[in-house]
Amino acid sequence: FLIPKLYVFDDQNKALFFHSANEGRVWTNIHQNPKVCFTAYEMGCITPAKLACSFGLEYRSVIVFGSLSVVQDQTEALRVLQLFMDKYAPHLEANEGYLPAIPDELSNLAVYRLDIAGWSGKQDKRSMGMPGAFRYEATAGEPHAHG
């Protein structure tokens, strides 16, 4: 199965972490088979061309293979949840912009650790300096012309 997840990479442990409910599809599947693969990508600029099939895209992507396990240690789970806050809300301060996770909250969720067995990555570098280059986000939501 495939399911989108927010993640953090912990350089200290060379592992990826996710969190989810402590029941449901993810929980059931990893207990049946902990072998997983994970993918992440980042899209950059689009470079136009005269022919539609000649357009280019700047990107970076990675596919990771490994085993997923549930983090059992409460201190480690709370540390990982703080990594999520540091990554996704770096502009907020703990105890000012939000209250950090506490042990009681762990009863309703699971923190998962993906130990990396291997990975494969790919990228295509382009430049916003190329003629006509643009970012998709800049055009999202604009009406499209049909001729």
Regions inferred by a protein language model and the residue ranges of each:
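Non-catalytic surface loops within mature trypsin-like serine protease
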Residues: 11, 42, 70, 116-118
